[in-house]
Amino acid sequence: MDLKQIEKLMIAMGRNKMKRIAIKRDGFELELERDTGPNIQEPVFYDNRLFAGFTQERPIPSDQNLGNPIVKEVGEKKEDKPVEGDFIVSPLVGTFYGAPSPESPAFVKPGDIVSEDTVVCIVEAMKVMNEVKAGMAGRVEEVLITNGDPVQFGSKLFRIVKA
């Protein structure tokens, strides 16, 4: 095997993303190993249906606007009224379900009175259904998330006015 053949073999290794090759033929041995740099995890791809309910707060500028400033008109700022009540938050990352099954009625709805031990929803994490209890007594004022939406640890699920 001459130098040209070895160079072609190295190019083929790069094209095919091979890390190592060993050749033994007629008393000739050749072993090539590529240093691929640090071990970087492959990108993770998510099913877009999981994020269908999310909206993007700020638009991503297109290639045409990269050199130009983005001008945004600002109207009158509305006074934010303080929100009355406390919040029930998600104790873990998962998927929010407001009912035990699709055919069942919701655990709670606005206007319902709950105690500390009342189950208000289920958060599914890794195929395990975890019941979320109110943790406080009061009246449900608002359901802040839609059935089937993903939730993060600490996401606000319900607004409660303590009794």
UniProtKB/Swiss-Prot annotation:
Pathway: Lipid metabolism; fatty acid biosynthesis. Residues 85-161 form the Biotinyl-binding domain. Pfam families: Biotin_lipoyl. The modification N6-biotinyllysine is found at K127. GO terms for cellular component: acetyl-CoA carboxylase complex. GO terms for biological process: fatty acid biosynthetic process. Keywords: Biotin, Fatty acid biosynthesis, Fatty acid metabolism, Lipid biosynthesis, Lipid metabolism. CDD domains: biotinyl_domain (cd06850). GO terms for molecular function: acetyl-CoA carboxylase activity. This protein is a component of the acetyl coenzyme A carboxylase complex; first, biotin carboxylase catalyzes the carboxylation of the carrier protein and then the transcarboxylase transfers the carboxyl group to form malonyl-CoA. Homodimer. This is Biotin carboxyl carrier protein of acetyl-CoA carboxylase.
